[in-house]
Curated annotation (Swiss-Prot):
This is Large ribosomal subunit protein uL22. It holds the Pfam family Ribosomal_L22. Residues 171-180 have a biased composition (Basic and acidic residues). One of its GO terms (cellular component) is cytosolic large ribosomal subunit.
């Protein structure tokens, strides 16, 4: 697999007062998307970490435009990650003289944006769209009939307890006092 180097720009925000785990939750939403899409997603994301991440992405886009002269319409969030910064430790008093530790975590957020050229029509289609078109074409084509299954053999009638009426014999009628 060959890798192509695209012109890029970097922005970092250090000592951001948000947990790296919470920042990564937001970062995963925008990785690989265009800068405009990423900023739209972050604008409406309910997480508090979306604001500092959006600021860093906007800063990286501004760096690309002003320092490198790149077109903002072609910028894509190529790499974005949150590393752990220093943790400030505080104390929360508890009952009976105890004290629990509060960890105020910080993050270092790094964003790399690249200017990628517009894709041609063929590669612009997603693989999902191509699969859907292929399945539609297969559905329109006349389907080959599968060999017909043999009809199952008829089952023998189930045995039932048939109640037979007692046959009239001369003995039974004589015993009852009947006349012959």
């Amino acid at each position: 697999m060959t890798t192509t180097e695209f012109p890029s720009a970097v922005a970092k925000a250090r000592f951001v007062r948000v947990s790296p785990r919470k920042a990564r939750r937001v970062i995963d939403l925008v990785r690989g998307r265009s800068v405009t899409d990423a900023l739209d997603i972050l604008r409406w994301a309910p997480q508090a970490a979306s604001e500092p991440v959006a600021k860093v992405i906007a800063s990286a886009a501004a760096n690309a435009q002003n320092n490198n002269g790149l077109d903002p319409a072609t910028l894509v969030v190529a790499t974005v990650y949150a590393d752990e910064g220093p943790t400030a430790k505080r104390i929360r008093p508890r009952a009976q003289g105890r004290a629990f530790r509060i960890r105020k975590r910080t993050s270092h957020i790094t964003v790399v944006v690249e200017s990628r050229p517009a894709k041609d029509q063929r590669s612009a289609k997603s693989s999902r769209t191509r699969r859907a078109e292929a399945s539609k074409a297969a559905a329109k084509a006349p389907a080959k009939k599968a060999p017909a299954k043999k009809a199952p053999a008829k089952k023998a009638p189930a045995k039932t307890a048939a109640k037979k009426a007692p046959a009239k014999t001369s003995e039974t009628s004589d015993a009852k006092g009947g006349s012959d």
